[in-house]
């Protein structure tokens, strides 16, 4: 059952709401415009608030649904987390869009909402506060994601290994943003 859910999660994660919505509305392809990222922040820049919110909700749901399904069929928290990571991998490397996806932050947040909601609240709160103070989405994601690890180590220790892997994936996916942050070139809102 685990492998079937992992594959299903990857395929669901591969549905890029940013790309689909941009095609449906005639908006620029987020992979070749703005920051080049197929995610909600770039959709906000390119297509406005409405499409950004729809992208965010779609990306949250595709992270959340596989984990909830994994829980429903009786997988343990670690297996649920690995299934959720498969959804994030789908977002990062979508099979339907030549493996050119987003950075996985919203999909990871949806996964975390289903896995352990207090950790998701911590991450979302840290993201909002950091974004409010810096107006920089990438920095907010890079600060918020690792903050969940101590709470998970304490309350959901069996999910700590996959969540550490997830954190490393998100940091790796933001490597160009890190270079821009250190060089003072990162985009702000």
Swiss-Prot record:
Pathway(s) where this gene product acts: Lipid metabolism; phospholipid metabolism
Location relative to the cell: Cell inner membrane
Keyword Lipid metabolism part of the UniProt annotation: yes
Coiled-coil annotated spans: none
UniProt protein name: Glycerol-3-phosphate acyltransferase
Entry annotated with the keyword Cytoplasm: no
Naturally occurring in which organism (per UniProt): Pseudomonas entomophila (strain L48)
Top-rank EC class of the record's enzyme: transferase
Segments crossing the lipid bilayer: 1-21, 50-70, 81-101, 111-131, 151-171
One Gene Ontology term, aspect cellular component: plasma membrane
GO BP: phospholipid biosynthetic process
Its biological purpose: Catalyzes the transfer of an acyl group from acyl-phosphate (acyl-PO(4)) to glycerol-3-phosphate (G3P) to form lysophosphatidic acid (LPA). This enzyme utilizes acyl-phosphate as fatty acyl donor, but not acyl-CoA or acyl-ACP.
Protein origin, superkingdom: Bacteria
Oligomeric form and interacting partners: Probably interacts with PlsX.
The reaction(s) this protein catalyses: an acyl phosphate + sn-glycerol 3-phosphate = a 1-acyl-sn-glycero-3-phosphate + phosphate
Any one GO molecular-function label of the UniProt entry: acyl-phosphate glycerol-3-phosphate acyltransferase activity
Protein family membership: Belongs to the PlsY family.
């Amino acid at each position: 059952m685990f492998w079937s859910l992992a594959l299903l999660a990857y395929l669901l994660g591969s549905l890029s709401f940013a790309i689909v919505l941009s095609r449906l509305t005639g908006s620029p392809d987020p992979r070749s415009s703005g920051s080049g990222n197929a995610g909600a922040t770039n959709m906000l820049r390119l297509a406005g608030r409405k499409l950004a919110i729809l992208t965010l909700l779609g990306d949250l749901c595709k992270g959340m649904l596989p984990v909830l399904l994994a829980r429903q069929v009786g997988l343990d928290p670690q297996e649920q987390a690995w299934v959720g990571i498969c959804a994030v991998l789908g977002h990062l490397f979508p099979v339907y869009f030549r493996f050119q996806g987003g950075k996985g932050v919203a999909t990871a947040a949806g996964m975390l909402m289903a896995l352990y909601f207090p950790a998701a609240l911590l991450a979302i709160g840290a993201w909002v506060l950091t974004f409010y103070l810096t107006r920089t989405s990438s920095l907010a994601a890079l600060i918020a994601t690792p903050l969940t690890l101590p709470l998970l180590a304490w309350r959901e220790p069996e999910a700590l290994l996959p969540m550490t892997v997830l954190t490393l994936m998100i940091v790796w996916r933001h490597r160009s943003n890190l270079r821009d942050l250190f060089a003072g070139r990162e985009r702000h809102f």
